[in-house]
C-alpha cells in the first residue's frame, strides 16, 4: 500500500499494484471524481493535480510515485470555501460542458499562487496565461473567458465573495462536484468492455464466449455480432464482457475465440469509386447507417455510390446546360473548381458512456447523451420494455457535438450485460474508441460552378457533393445551397460514397461547413473575376434579409473596412482578411415544460440535457424575466427522462423549442396564481409575494406554433422549396416531430490570418463574427457558445487531420497526441455581434445558434489565406505541406 496526504488528510491505496495510476486511485478508491480522465497521454490536462506544490498529470503518474507526498485535487483547493480562481471562473463563465474545467482550475490556481507571490498587483497578459495553460485543452472552446478569468484572479479581483455567476451549475463544475455519466458508481457495479473487429471486411465464422466466462472476475459475456454476420469496418462490435474491474474485463476479452473469413475491403472515397471496387453492400438490401439528422428516403444505388439526390435543385437542367455552354466557350466569368474536406472527429471529452441497472423489469440508464427523452423511448423499443419502465438520466454531459444522438454500442452493451450479470454495468469508451468508432463529420469532394453575367448577376449555380461517411449514408451538403444566393437556375446534387470505414455522424451543422468552404471560396473567385468587392457581391447576390443587415454591419468593421491598410502581401510573414457567409434552418420540437410553485419557490423542469450550452440558465433566466425575479431565484430540474418531454440537443432546436413552451407555461401559471390569490393579496402585488404566499401548484405547457410571419409569408424555407421541399417538411413533422420554422439563421464572418511562407504555418490573428439569430436569451452564455463554435471551425480549417491506415481503415490519429485540436495559444480574440431582429413571430423572439456559428469559419480562413498569399487552398485542413506546395506552384491546391 502507498501512503500519502490527499487534500490535507492521510490516505493509503488499497493495494500495491505497480501498474496502478494516481488517477485510478483518486477516482476509484478515493471517490474524487472531479479529476477527469480524457486523453490518458498527458496531453489535455483534465487530470491535473498538485503534488508537493507543483502541477502534474495524474493519468501518467504511478500511484507509488506519490508515496509520502502531498496531493491536492480540485476538491481540495479551498476546503469549504472557493479559491479566487474558482470565483473568477464562475463570474466570467469560463466553462461550457465543464469536463475539462477542474484541470484548468487546478493549473490556474497554481499560476495564481506563483503570480501573486512574485508580481502582486499586476495582471498577466494573454500570452503569459496561454503559456501557463498550454498543457490544457477545451473542446468546447471557452478559452477567451478562461483567459479573462485567470487574468482578473491573478490581479487580485476575486479575493472576496462574489455574486452569482451567469451559469447556474458553475460552482459544481469549478469544484469537481458535477457528476457525469463516467462518475456514476453503484454498489456492486461491474465494468464492461467491447471486443472489436480487427478486420475491415469479413464474414464472422466463429464466436466462442465460454473461455471468457472462465476468466476469474468475469461475470457476463454477450455477442454483439452473430456468427455469419458481415463485418464492414475495423472496430465493429463483436462481443462484450462485464467483470469486477477493467483488468479482469480485458483478460476476458482476450480469452474470447473469434474466427473471420477475410473479404476484400475498400477504404476511402477514391478507392470506393474505382471501377471494380469491392462492394460494401452487394445485395439488394442496403442496411446502411444514417449519418445525417433527417430521415432517409428511397434513393438509387450503383455499387458503392448512392444517389443522385437532387430534389432541391431549381431548374437544374437549365443550370447544367448554362454551365456546360460556358465551359465550351471558355467564359471568363465561369468559376469552377473541385474542393476536398477531410473528416473531423467530434472529440467530446466525456466519452460515450452508459451505466445500466435493472430492477425487476425496470431499467435505469445513466447515459452521456444529447437526447434523454428520445433515448428512453428508443431503449424501451430496442429491448422490448414498456416506456414507463425505462428511465434515462444525464445530470451533466461532457460534450457531444452531434455524436450522442442515438443508441450506440456502449448503451447496448451496458444494458445487455447488466441483464446477463444481474448487476449494474458501466461501459465507458477509452479515448481510442471515442475517436475511432463513435462517428465523425464526413469528408467530401465538392464540385462547384458559378456563372455570372456581364452585368454581375448570378445566372447559374452547380454543386455536386460526394460524401465520405464510411458505411453510413444520407449526408446533405449540396442541398443547403438552395438557401444561399439567388440564382434562377441551380443544379444541386448529393451522392453518398460508401466504403469499409466506421459510420459518420452528425456534427454541428451537418453538411454546412463543407458547403460553405467550397461555395464561399467560389463566390470570392467570382468577385475577383468581376473586379468587385467580395462583400458587395454577396450583398447583391444574397437576398436574405438577416444576412443583408449583417453585410451592412460588417462593411463598417475595421477588420474589413481597413483591410487594405493592414494587409501584408510580401515578405515571409503575410497578412490578409477573408469573408464568408452561411445560413442554417430554424428548427423546433413540440416539447413540454413544467412550471411549478413548491414551498413558495418557482421552479421549471423538462427532460432536456445540458452538454455545455447552458440550458439550465436559459430556462431560469426566461422564467425570472417573466415573473420579475432573479435567475438564482428559480429552481431548475433537467437531465431525467421522467420529467416533461423535452427536446434533443441537436440542430440548434433546444432553446427555440423550450423558451416558447416556458413562456406559455408562465402565462398559464400567472392566470392560475392571480385567481388563487384573489382576495388574499392585492391585485397589484409583485409576483415574488404572490409566489411566496401560494400553495403548491404545477402545470405544463406545450410549445405553441409560431405566429405567421408576413416577411416569410407563413412558410418555412423547406416549404418554399417546391413539392419536394414541402414533402420533406411534412416527413420531418410527421415522423421526427421536428418543425421547420419560418426564416433561417445567418452568419457573416471575417478572419484575419498571418501566413508564414517559409514554414507554411497559418494562424488566425483576429476574428469578427456577425450572427443573426433573433433575440439572444442569455447573452453571456450565447457569446461563449458562439466563440467555441468558431474555435472548432478554426480547428477544422487548420489542424484537425483524421488519418487512416490505407489497408485496414484503422484510425491512426485516435488520440489527442496525434489528432490536434486548437489549444489556447492557437485562438485569437474573437469579437461577436448579434443582430437580434427578424424573429418577432417566435415567442421569445429568438432561435438557436450552435450550428450556424461554426459554418463559415473554414471558408473565411481560406479566403483570408488567398488574400494574404495569393494562393487558393481547395483542401482542408490547410496543412503546412499543402500551403508550401501551393506557394511553390503559385496556384490553387
Name what the model sees in each region.
Residues 1, 44-45, 190-191, 227-228, ...:
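Short glycine-rich loop/turn motifs
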Residues 108-112, 143, 151-152, 252-255, ...:
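Short acidic, glycine/serine/threonine-rich loops at helix termini
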Residues 9, 127, 131-181, 554, ...:
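Intrinsic disorder at enzyme termini
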Residues 123, 384-391, 419-425, 476-580, ...:
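C-terminal catalytic domains of large/alpha subunits in multi-subunit enzymes
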Residues 70, 211-220, 389, 455, ...:
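Glycine-centered tight turns that cap/initiate beta-strands
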Residues 159-172, 262-289, 293-317, 323-324, ...:
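Terminal domain-initiation and capping elements
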Residues 1-164:
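Signature of N-terminal electron-transfer/Fe-S-associated modules in redox systems
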Residues 156-378, 500, 504, 550-583, ...:
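Extended, polar/acidic
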Amino acid at each position: 500500500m502507498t501512503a500519502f496526504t490527499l487534500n490535507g488528510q492521510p490516505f493509503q491505496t488499497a493495494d500495491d499494484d505497480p501498474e496502478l495510476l494516481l488517477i485510478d486511485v483518486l477516482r476509484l478508491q478515493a471517490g474524487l471524481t472531479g479529476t477527469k480522465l480524457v486523453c490518458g497521454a498527458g496531453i489535455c490536462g483534465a487530470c491535473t493535480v498538485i503534488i508537493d506544490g507543483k502541477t502534474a498529470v495524474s493519468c501518467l503518474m504511478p500511484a507509488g510515485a506519490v508515496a509520502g507526498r502531498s496531493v491536492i485535487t480540485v476538491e481540495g483547493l479551498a476546503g469549504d470555501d472557493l479559491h479566487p480562481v474558482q470565483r473568477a471562473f464562475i463570474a466570467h463563465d469560463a466553462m461550457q460542458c465543464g469536463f475539462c474545467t477542474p484541470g484548468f482550475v487546478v493549473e490556474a490556481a497554481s499560476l495564481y499562487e506563483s503570480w501573486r507571490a512574485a508580481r502582486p498587483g499586476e495582471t498577466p497578459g494573454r500570452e503569459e496565461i496561454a503559456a501557463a495553460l498550454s498543457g490544457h485543452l477545451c473542446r468546447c472552446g471557452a478559452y477567451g473567458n478562461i483567459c479573462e478569468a485567470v487574468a482578473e484572479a491573478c490581479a487580485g479581483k476575486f479575493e472576496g465573495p462574489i455574486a452569482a455567476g451567469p451559469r447556474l451549475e458553475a460552482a459544481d463544475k469549478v469544484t469537481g462536484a458535477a457528476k457525469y455519466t463516467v462518475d456514476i458508481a453503484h454498489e456492486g457495479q461491474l465494468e464492461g468492455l467491447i471486443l472489436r473487429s480487427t478486420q475491415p471486411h469479413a464474414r464472422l465464422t466463429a464466436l466462442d464466449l465460454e473461455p471468457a466466462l472462465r476468466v476469474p472476475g468475469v461475470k457476463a459475456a454477450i455477442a454483439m455480432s452473430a456468427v455469419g454476420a458481415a463485418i464492414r469496418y475495423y472496430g465493429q462490435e463483436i462481443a462484450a464482457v462485464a467483470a469486477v474491474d477493467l483488468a479482469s474485463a480485458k483478460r476476458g476479452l482476450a480469452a474470447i475465440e473469434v474466427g473471420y473469413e477475410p473479404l476484400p475491403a475498400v477504404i476511402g472515397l477514391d478507392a470506393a469509386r474505382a471501377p471494380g471496387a469491392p462492394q460494401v453492400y452487394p445485395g439488394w438490401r442496403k442496411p446502411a447507417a444514417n449519418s445525417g439528422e433527417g430521415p432517409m428516403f428511397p434513393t438509387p444505388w450503383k455499387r458503392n455510390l448512392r444517389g443522385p439526390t437532387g430534389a432541391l435543385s431549381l431548374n437544374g437542367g437549365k443550370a447544367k446546360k448554362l454551365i456546360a455552354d460556358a465551359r465550351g466557350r471558355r467564359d471568363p466569368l465561369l468559376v469552377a473548381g473541385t474542393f476536398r474536406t477531410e473528416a473531423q472527429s467530434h472529440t467530446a471529452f466525456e466519452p460515450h458512456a452508459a451505466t445500466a441497472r435493472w430492477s425487476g423489469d425496470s431499467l435505469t440508464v445513466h447515459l452521456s447523451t444529447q437526447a434523454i427523452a428520445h433515448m428512453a423511448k428508443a431503449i424501451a423499443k430496442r429491448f422490448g420494455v414498456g416506456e414507463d419502465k425505462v428511465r434515462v438520466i444525464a445530470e451533466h454531459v461532457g460534450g457531444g457535438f452531434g455524436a450522442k444522438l442515438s443508441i450506440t454500442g456502449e448503451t447496448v452493451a451496458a444494458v445487455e450485460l447488466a441483464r446477463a450479470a444481474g448487476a449494474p454495468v458501466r461501459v465507458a469508451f477509452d479515448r481510442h474508441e471515442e475517436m475511432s468508432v463513435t462517428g465523425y463529420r464526413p469528408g467530401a469532394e465538392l464540385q462547384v460552378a458559378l456563372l455570372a453575367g456581364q452585368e454581375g448577376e448570378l445566372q447559374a449555380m452547380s454543386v455536386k457533393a460526394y460524401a465520405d461517411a464510411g458505411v453510413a449514408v444520407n449526408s446533405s451538403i449540396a442541398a443547403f445551397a438552395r438557401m444561399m444566393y439567388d440564382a434562377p437556375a441551380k443544379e444541386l446534387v448529393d451522392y453518398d460514397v460508401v466504403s469499409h470505414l466506421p459510420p459518420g455522424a452528425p456534427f454541428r451543422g451537418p453538411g454546412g461547413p463543407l458547403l460553405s468552404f467550397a461555395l464561399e471560396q467560389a463566390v470570392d473567385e467570382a468577385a475577383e473575376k468581376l473586379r468587385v468587392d467580395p462583400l458587395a457581391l454577396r450583398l447583391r447576390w444574397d437576398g436574405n434579409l438577416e444576412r443583408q443587415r449583417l453585410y451592412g454591419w460588417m462593411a463598417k468593421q475595421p477588420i474589413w473596412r481597413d483591410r487594405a491598410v493592414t494587409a501584408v502581401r510580401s515578405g515571409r510573414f503575410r497578412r490578409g482578411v477573408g469573408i464568408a457567409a452561411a445560413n442554417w434552418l430554424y428548427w423546433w420540437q413540440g416539447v413540454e415544460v413544467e412550471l411549478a410553485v413548491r414551498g413558495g419557490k418557482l421552479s421549471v423542469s423538462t427532460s432536456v440535457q445540458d452538454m455545455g450550452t447552458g440550458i439550465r440558465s436559459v430556462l431560469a433566466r426566461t422564467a425570472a424575466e417573466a415573473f420579475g425575479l432573479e435567475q438564482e431565484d428559480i429552481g431548475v430540474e433537467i437531465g431525467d427522462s421522467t420529467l416533461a418531454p423535452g427536446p434533443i440537443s441537436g440542430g440548434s432546436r433546444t432553446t427555440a423549442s423550450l423558451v416558447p413552451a416556458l413562456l406559455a407555461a408562465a402565462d398559464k401559471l400567472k392566470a392560475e396564481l392571480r385567481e388563487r390569490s384573489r382576495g388574499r393579496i392585492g391585485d397589484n402585488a409583485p409576483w415574488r409575494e404572490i409566489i411566496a404566499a401560494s400553495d403548491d401548484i404545477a402545470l405544463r405547457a406545450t410549445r405553441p406554433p409560431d405566429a405567421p410571419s408576413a416577411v416569410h409569408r407563413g412558410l418555412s424555407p423547406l416549404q418554399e422549396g417546391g413539392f419536394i421541399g414541402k414533402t420533406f417538411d411534412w416527413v420531418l413533422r410527421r415522423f421526427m416531430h421536428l418543425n421547420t420554422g419560418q426564416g433561417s439563421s445567418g452568419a457573416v464572418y471575417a478572419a484575419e490570418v498571418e501566413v508564414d511562407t517559409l514554414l507554411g504555418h497559418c494562424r488566425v490573428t483576429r476574428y469578427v463574427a456577425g450572427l443573426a439569430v433573433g433575440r439572444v436569451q442569455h447573452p453571456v452564455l450565447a457569446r461563449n457558445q458562439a466563440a467555441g463554435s468558431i474555435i472548432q471551425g478554426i480547428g477544422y480549417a487548420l489542424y484537425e487531420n483524421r488519418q487512416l491506415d490505407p489497408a485496414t481503415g484503422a484510425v491512426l490519429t485516435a488520440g489527442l497526441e496525434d489528432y490536434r485540436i486548437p489549444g489556447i495559444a492557437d485562438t485569437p480574440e474573437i469579437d461577436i455581434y448579434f443582430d437580434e431582429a427578424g424573429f418577432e413571430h417566435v415567442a421569445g423572439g429568438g432561435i438557436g445558434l450552435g450550428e450556424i456559428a461554426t459554418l463559415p469559419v473554414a471558408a473565411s480562413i481560406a479566403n483570408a489565406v488567398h488574400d494574404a498569399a495569393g494562393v487558393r487552398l481547395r483542401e482542408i485542413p490547410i496543412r503546412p505541406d499543402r500551403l508550401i506546395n501551393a506557394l511553390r506552384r503559385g496556384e490553387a491546391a
